[in-house]
């Protein structure tokens, strides 16, 4: 009878219905799918939440009159109505194709107590009453749409209620007399309650749920460099079996948001129904993240002597590099070296069935550090490597880990003559494995956050890798505490 912004459907709608318009292309970077199983769980939780909320509902007073033989017309008023107990025995939340959601409650019971007053000219009488309302049935259709601002709009498109039976017992002075006309009073009580049920529901959606949805953010912070845009690209798509909600799913720079030059791919989602909720995350989300961190210089690195282990026989100076570049020690005796590396372009993560991979192309330039603090370039290298990736799906985010392949080094330019590329490959492999990749993996371990609100917990996760996207399935638990 009453919805509340604290109940699971409100939280679920808040998670799913966060609209903005104007994305590049028509394809989302993230899709959330709710199955029948998920909707059944929502209906069960809503029933428990409503049962708790009903005890706090203020029912309206109502009045009327009855004609009593020898007394004439008697005006009565029922007030101070309180719900003493309620049993909501059945509920269902179903999809309305191309519209939204249908929520129903059936075969429910409420017991109400309160006070009554009777007025007949100078006659003033009062007492208490007890009402048992049986066989309550409520049917509500929710229309899901969007505002011009891009945020969600939820409205009650239809509402109906029916009460099978009302039993009124009146006590107090002349209560026995009013009980003689309980049929009239019960009929009046039924009509008032049936009209108020839908009024309360519509008011709750309009004054509580809709304003709540308007306050929902459409972006979230990942770290000081990046944020996630999980605004929706259109109205949720309801079919008879599932509800698909399309998010933009773009990682953006928090300092300087720039347009992305590529589009999200089409995701052909499998027909899976064993979990309550599924998340389909395209390579668009991960590759926009790669753009952000590449542009911020996060993938750049510098190798100096202080990052070489103290017990290493190879130091970052011209004496040690004599094995790679024989002339360098003669041209710059006892001089420290610095290697500056940068990934040429943002690595692109490739999804294929059961496999994740990427390729990185780096450029490394070496400088000798002269006594006057001048850095003089001496050689330039091109470095290529293939990397496999592993992903883990936990209760709130996706984390990653890179497993690097062997690097390939090519000499692009040398100002110090002949070069032993193979030996330098071994040195660079050591550094990348022990410094560069651990830094990247630490960042990947922080994870890609899923668009969840507080009190929503995921469990029994599964992860599948398909062409161009990840497909994650999970069950949902609403935490009451």
Swiss-Prot record:
Q: Which gene encodes it?
A: LBP
Identify the stretch annotated as signal peptide in this record: 1-25
Major localization class: secreted
**Assembly and oligomerization:** When bound to LPS, interacts (via C-terminus) with soluble and membrane-bound CD14.
Say what the protein does: Plays a role in the innate immune response. Binds to the lipid A moiety of bacterial lipopolysaccharides (LPS), a glycolipid present in the outer membrane of all Gram-negative bacteria. Acts as an affinity enhancer for CD14, facilitating its association with LPS. Promotes the release of cytokines in response to bacterial lipopolysaccharide.
Disulphides: 159-198
Which Gene3D superfamilies does this UniProt record tie to the protein?
Answer: Bactericidal permeability-increasing protein, domain 1, Bactericidal permeability-increasing protein, domain 2
Q: Is DNA repair set as a keyword in this record?
A: no
Q: Which residues are glycosylated?
A: 300, 355, 386, 394
Single Gene Ontology BP annotation? acute-phase response
Q: Name one GO cellular component term.
A: membrane
Name of the protein described by the UniProt record: Lipopolysaccharide-binding protein
Residues in a coiled coil are none
């Amino acid at each position: 009878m009453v919805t509340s912004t604290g109940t699971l459907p409100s939280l679920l709608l808040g998670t799913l219905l966060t609209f903005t318009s104007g994305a590049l292309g028509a394809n989302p970077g993230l899709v959330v799918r709710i199955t029948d199983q998920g909707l059944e769980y929502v209906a069960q939780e809503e029933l428990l939440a409503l049962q708790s909320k009903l005890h706090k509902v203020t029912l309206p007073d109502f009045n009327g009159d009855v004609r009593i033989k020898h007394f004439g017309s008697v005006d009565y008023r029922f007030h101070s109505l309180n719900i003493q107990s309620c049993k909501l025995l059945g509920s269902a939340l179903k999809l309305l194709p191309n519209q939204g959601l249908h929520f129903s409650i059936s075969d429910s019971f409420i017991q109400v107590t309160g006070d009554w007053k009777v007025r007949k000219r100078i006659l003033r009488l009062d007492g208490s009453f007890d009402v048992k309302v049986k066989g309550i049935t409520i049917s509500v259709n929710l229309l899901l749409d969007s505002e011009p601002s891009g945020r969600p709009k939820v409205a009650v498109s239809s509402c109906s209620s029916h009460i099978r039976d009302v039993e009124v017992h009146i006590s107090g002075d002349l209560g026995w007399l009013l009980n003689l006309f309980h049929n009239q009073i019960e009929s009046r009580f039924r009509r008032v309650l049936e009209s108020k049920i839908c009024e309360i529901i519509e008011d709750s959606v309009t004054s509580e749920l809709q304003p709540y949805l308007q306050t929902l953010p459409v972006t979230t912070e990942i770290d000081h460099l990046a944020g996630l845009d999980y605004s929706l690209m259109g109205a949720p798509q309801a079919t008879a079996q599932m509800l698909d909600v399309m998010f933009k799913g773009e990682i953006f720079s928090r300092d300087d948001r720039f347009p992305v030059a590529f589009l999200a791919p089409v995701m052909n989602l499998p027909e899976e129904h064993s979990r309550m909720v599924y998340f389909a995350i395209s390579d668009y989300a991960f590759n926009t993240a790669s753009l952000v961190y590449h542009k911020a210089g996060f993938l750049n690195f510098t190798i100096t002597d202080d990052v070489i282990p103290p017990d290493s026989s190879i130091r970052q100076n011209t004496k040690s590099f004599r094995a790679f570049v024989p002339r360098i020690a003669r041209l710059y005796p006892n001089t420290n070296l610095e290697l500056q590396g940068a990934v040429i372009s943002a690595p692109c993560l490739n999804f294929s069935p059961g496999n994740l991979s990427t390729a990185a192309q780096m450029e490394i330039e070496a400088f000798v550090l002269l006594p006057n603090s001048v850095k003089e370039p001496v050689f330039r290298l091109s470095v290529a490597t293939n990397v496999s990736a592993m992903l883990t799906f936990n209760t709130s985010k996706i984390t990653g880990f890179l497993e690097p392949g062997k690097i390939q080094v090519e000499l692009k330019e040398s100002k110090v003559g002949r070069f032993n590329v193979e030996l330098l490959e071994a040195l660079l492999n050591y550094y990348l494995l022990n410094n560069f990749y651990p830094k990247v993996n630490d960042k990947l371990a922080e994870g890609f956050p899923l668009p969840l609100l507080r009190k929503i917990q995921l469990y029994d996760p599964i992860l599948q890798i398909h062409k161009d996207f990840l497909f994650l399935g999970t069950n949902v638990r609403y935490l009451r505490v």
